[in-house]
């Protein structure tokens, strides 16, 4: 029943001639930004055969360099072969149904709207799982730090130094932070050139959704998908080669249900991830004043 203007008297008292109007445009819905394609590699996605499979990834052997001694016999090294294994051992699913009557009477394509939402939610769910796991694999772990706009630069430079010492290539380095720390960066001496007028500012590059530029050689991404435990957020820095990730929707079906007058869609997303180079991954546990939810 629509809300009517207050009235007195007996003329048209029930509001029967005031229609309810439903907008065809759905209310805007916002989704967490996802950055797995930017911070991990997907070199082995083509090897996925389904949940329960695995991919053996061979490591390049290390050749020893010895000093040459004139007249001494040459010593030939026994080469050690090693590998790591990427297990496709995780899966997420979704399933929903729309009654035929609802589909026929609706003025919007409900199935299409729900499918769009499912695609976003699937990406977010996987990213939360990956980010919530790989920080435990980091070869470098900084001490928990209370971050402010005064110390955020020194804190981030520690991560850059760790990546330099690991000999990671300058390209494809990254750091992923919560929005609050992103805000501190913009309030600090790292603020971008448009705010400071300083062509030598450390924070540089174009700003886009979830990306606020570069600090040193690290792309800076802002995410709501980081893990927080006991008030400590597990921020991460690394190189794209550090973690490999493989994912596929192996079972996406549209069904006509047998026992109901309804259609349904269900999907199965199988995936796996593996830290290949722990030294190219830095854990930056941080505390900060939270804003909002």
What would you call each of these model-derived segments?
Residues 100-168, 283-293:
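Alpha-helical scaffold segments that mediate packing/assembly in large oligomeric complexes
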Residues 90, 100, 177-179, 269:
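Short, structured patches in soluble enzyme cores that scaffold and shape functional sites
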Residues 2-42, 46-64, 79-88, 95, ...:
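Sequence/fold signature of self-assembling virion shell proteins
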Residues 70-77:
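Short Gly/aromatic-enriched secondary-structure transition segments
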Residues 138-207:
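Extended, solvent-exposed, turn-rich assembly/linker loops in the middle of proteins
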Residues 68-69, 108:
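A short, polar/proline- and glycine-enriched secondary-structure boundary/capping micro-motif
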Residues 52, 93, 170-172:
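Short coil/turn connectors at secondary-structure junctions
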